[in-house]
Amino acid sequence: RGHSYKVSDLFTALLTISANDAAMALAQATGSLSQGMAVINAEARHLQADDTVAVTPNGLDAPSQHTSAYDLALFARQGLQMPAFLKYDQTTSGQFRIGKKKSVGLWNQNSLLATYPGALGGKIGWTSAAGATYVGMAKRGGHTLVVTLLHCPALTEINAAKQLLNWGFKVDGKVSPVGTLAGPQSATPSPAALPAPSRTVA
């Protein structure tokens, strides 16, 4: 409280250490919390993530909030097309400035980045309702895979993701897909509703 922060720093804190307060600040930077949630849900509709209703900006449990592994894959695919997102998500460590004289260290909780060749990024999470969750992306030999996990036993999600990615790369071109991810709708949400990375917010 009483400090201002760069939007880019808030995104980095959100994606590296799951800073729930950063998610709240980013949502409110759209004008209000309700406006921020409207932007999030509009983006979900644009991506045809129809299993998703966001109630909290940080994903903490709330009545009527829900998503699916399928929708998380849609979000990850979209993130892979956004250089700014990848920059924040692939940050392994850094400093988060608080005021003019103080800073705290950031270390990316996604250990896949440092331990899996070809890892592109991802996000680890946990809530009481969802259990341990994980979204991970990796690329090898020109082939990109996304893996999504929900309700994992604690501390097993990274190893489970590695096993799924290993299998996916091993069978590339040898198996038939059971389906395809829906593409985004043609109309896009207004980017003016989103805070610019260079902006400072209180």
Please provide the spans of the model-predicted regions.
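Active-site-adjacent loops and short helices of periplasmic peptidoglycan-processing enzymes
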Residues: 1-70, 74
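Domain-terminus/edge residues, biased toward the C-terminal soluble/receptor-binding domains
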Residues: 49-53, 57, 61-202
